[in-house]
Regions:
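Charge-rich, low-complexity N-terminal segments
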Residues: 1-120
Length: 120
């Protein structure tokens, strides 16, 4: 049996989008309450009954959240233009080697705007 496991995380951060068009509201300093969904997919282990241990996903994501929470995202290497697309790809790059079966990162910047990233 195959299954997908998703774990949700949140962080608060400020940002500017320096490459947004002149006059765009996101060029100025602003912040979001971000929600991140990390999904792994694979075969369910017949012994444990799970695809992957939730705690291991949390352990991989926790140091990243510590770096991002209440930060100015533009100051973080790789997030100089921190669009939700770039944030999703950044998480993927950091987690791919730590989370076997990583299949999707979703970054929500508002309740109605999100980016779904499934690797390059």
């Amino acid at each position: 049996m195959r299954a997908r496991l998703t774990k949700d995380f949140t962080f608060e951060a400020a940002q500017t989008l320096p490459n947004a068009p002149e006059g765009h509201k996101c060029r100025g300093m602003h912040g979001h309450s971000f929600k991140i969904e990390v999904s792994v997919e694979g075969d369910v282990d017949p012994k444990t009954g799970w695809v992957y241990d939730h705690a291991e996903i949390g352990a991989a994501v926790k140091p990243l959240l510590k770096m991002l929470d209440h930060s100015y995202l533009n100051d973080i290497e790789g997030l100089e233009n921190p669009t939700i697309e770039e944030i999703a790809a950044w998480f993927w790059g950091k987690l791919q080697s730590q989370c076997p079966g990583l299949c999707e990162i979703v970054v929500h910047e508002t309740p109605t705007a999100r980016c779904v990233y499934r690797g390059e």
